[in-house]
Amino acid sequence: MISFGMPTLIELNSLEESAALCRELGLKFIELNMSFPQNQLEKLDADELLRIKERYGIFYTVHLDEELNPCSLNSGVRQAYVENVLGVVELAKKLGIPTLNMHMLRGIYCTLPTKRVFIYEENEAVYLEYLRQFRDRVTEAIGDSGVKICVENTDGFDLPFLLHGLDLLLESPAFAMTYDIGHDYAINCADKPIIMERAARLRHMHMHDALGTKVHLALGDGEMDLESYLRLAEEHDCRVVLETKTVAALRQSARWLYGRTV
């Protein structure tokens, strides 16, 4: 069964305010975005999170820091990111957080006269080794808790090293997939075949409408066949974040979704 939730919204000043809106709209969870200052690991109080969770009858997922790079060539930076994720895993186990959403970064590139060359592309063996180390440490930490780290399509899996990295992560049962349908639509659904080939590992979805390359629209404001994605989410029991950027767009998306005034 699908569970619908909301993202961290910059207009809302506190988690309690977000939780109140989440309950008002009939949503089930809040995705805590760790790119926001209030959601840094050292600022997240497990007891307070639990209090809000119980008061409003919701749960949480986590969007890991969008700059997370466990493959950084700088060993200190790499270790810091890995330790951060391990800390989030421990928090997730305490609070029953089922999903940690993760981006895969392309890294830096060099612009040659005829093409871009990505550093990770030229050093794929190193990239994959660091990713393997990350996967194995996280898998051990997660154990049998049921927490999943879901890898999101963001800018596309068009670079071979990204696809190889995705499949390396999916070798572990601790990893699964997030399908961001709006971002995929903006690149002419280039990632859809990749997602569908691995659909058995689909657990999470970021849902927003799109009009051409304009994304994060309220549901119903774009041109996407949203019903087909809802069927896909239903088939795989996905948790679905209504990933708008404003409260107004979130309200509109909830109205569209439930067909009622909220």
Where are these regions (language model features)?
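Histidine-acidic metal/acid-base catalytic patches
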Residues: 1-3, 12, 16-23, 71, ...
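Hydrophobic "anchor" residues on beta-strands that sit immediately upstream
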Residues: 27, 59, 148, 176, ...
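Active-site acidic/histidine proton-transfer and metal-coordination neighborhood
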Residues: 55, 74-176
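Soluble or luminal CAZymes and related metallo-dependent hydrolases
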Residues: 14, 41-44, 80-84, 123-134, ...
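Alpha-helix-loop-beta-strand connector modules within alpha/beta enzyme cores
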Residues: 49-67, 129-142, 226-232
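A cross-domain feature marking catalytic cores of carbohydrate-active enzymes
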Residues: 6-10, 32-36, 60-66, 102-104, ...
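N-terminal pre-domain/capping segments
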Residues: 1-93, 258-262
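Short secondary-structure capping/turn micro-motifs that flank functional sites
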Residues: 38-39, 69-70, 108-109, 158-159, ...
